[in-house]
């Protein structure tokens, strides 16, 4: 019997509340966008299967709450993640400055050697941009991690961000991960987490 996929990768989206993590996930998984996405409580996830270098890759993408009060809940989701996207808002300098704190969370909770990607979201809001591309790029380069600016609103680089992460994980894992191993890691179906009513736009 042919397997449904060759690889199963668990990805995690982390970053301050309001930077657009949920919107990035919606754009990539469902190709939809909403101006007023309600804040995530705890975690939510979506699944999308892609073709990568002739292989079928199933991406299970977890969207975590950025609020401090949920930090203890979401920290457990770092374990077992193959790749982690650290997202900031290019119009919010604080969210960029807090990237270092999020990277420390990865070091504390995630599996050693986990793939990382820095994502500057809301790149369409050029008139409000405060974090310059060159500054973020130099920071990412100093850490040896890839960097992309994205816009969930106009879909710019969203696909590229997740494909970059998937390709990196695949290269790191090589051919050692067979379907039998990865299927055992987690077996879930697409679903929606519970959200609260604090609304806020994300681009």
From Swiss-Prot:
Gene that specifies this protein: ypt-1
Motif extent (Effector region): 37-45
Residues linked to a lipid group, S-geranylgeranyl cysteine type: 202-203
Entry GO MF terms: GTP binding; GTPase activity
Pfam family name, one: Ras
CDD domains per record: Rab1_Ypt1 (cd01869)
Gene3D superfamilies, per database record: P-loop containing nucleotide triphosphate hydrolases
Activity regulation field: Rab activation is generally mediated by a guanine exchange factor (GEF), while inactivation through hydrolysis of bound GTP is catalyzed by a GTPase activating protein (GAP).
Organism of provenance: Neurospora crassa (strain ATCC 24698 / 74-OR23-1A / CBS 708.71 / DSM 1257 / FGSC 987)
Mode of membrane association: Peripheral membrane protein; Lipid-anchor
Location(s) in or outside the cell: Endoplasmic reticulum membrane; Golgi apparatus membrane; Cytoplasm; Preautophagosomal structure membrane
Keyword Acyltransferase in record: no
Sequence segments annotated as region (Disordered): 180-203
Gene Ontology biological process terms from the UniProt entry: autophagosome assembly; intracellular protein transport
Family membership noted in the UniProt record: Belongs to the small GTPase superfamily. Rab family.
Protein name: GTP-binding protein ypt1
Tree of life domain: Eukaryota
InterPro entries found in the cross-reference section: P-loop_NTPase, Rab, Small_GTP-bd, Small_GTPase
Binding locations of GTP: 15-23, 33-40, 63-67, 121-124, 151-153
């Amino acid at each position: 019997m042919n397997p449904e996929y060759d690889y199963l990768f668990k990805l995690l989206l982390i970053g301050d509340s309001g930077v657009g993590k949920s919107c990035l996930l919606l754009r990539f998984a469902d190709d939809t966008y909403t101006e007023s996405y309600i804040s995530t409580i705890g975690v939510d996830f979506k699944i999308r299967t892609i073709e990568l270098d002739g292989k079928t890759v199933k991406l299970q993408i977890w969207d975590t709450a950025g609020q401090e009060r949920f930090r203890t809940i979401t920290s457990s989701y770092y374990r077992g993640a193959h790749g982690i996207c650290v997202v900031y808002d290019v119009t919010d300098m604080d969210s960029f400055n807090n990237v270092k704190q999020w990277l420390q969370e990865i070091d504390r909770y995630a599996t050693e050697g986990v793939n990382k990607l820095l994502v500057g979201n809301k790149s369409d809001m050029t008139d409000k941009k405060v974090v310059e591309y060159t500054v973020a790029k130099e920071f990412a380069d100093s850490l040896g991690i890839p960097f992309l600016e994205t816009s969930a609103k106009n879909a710019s680089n969203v696909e590229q961000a997740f494909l970059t992460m998937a390709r990196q994980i695949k290269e790191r894992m090589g051919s050692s991960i067979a379907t039998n191993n990865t299927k055992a890691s987690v077996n879930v179906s697409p679903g929606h987490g519970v959200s609260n009513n604090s609304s806020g736009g994300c681009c």
